[in-house]
Amino acid sequence: QEYRGWMDF
């Protein structure tokens, strides 16, 4: 949940 710019890991 670190790349809240393109995906939601």
UniProtKB/Swiss-Prot annotation:
Top-level lineage group: Eukaryota
Keyword Secreted (UniProt): yes
A GO cellular component annotation in the UniProt record: extracellular region
InterPro entries membership: Gastrin/cholecystokinin_CS
Modified residues (Pyrrolidone carboxylic acid): Q1
Localization (cell): Secreted
Summary of the tissues where the protein is detected: Expressed by the skin glands.
Keywords: Amidation, Amphibian defense peptide, Hypotensive agent, Pyrrolidone carboxylic acid, Secreted
Gene Ontology annotations of biological process type: defense response; regulation of blood pressure
Main subcellular location of this protein, as a coarse class: secreted
Modified residues (Phenylalanine amide): F9
UniProt keyword Secreted, yes or no: yes
Function: Hypotensive neuropeptide.
Family from the record: Belongs to the gastrin/cholecystokinin family.
Name recorded for this polypeptide: [Arg4]-Phyllocaerulein
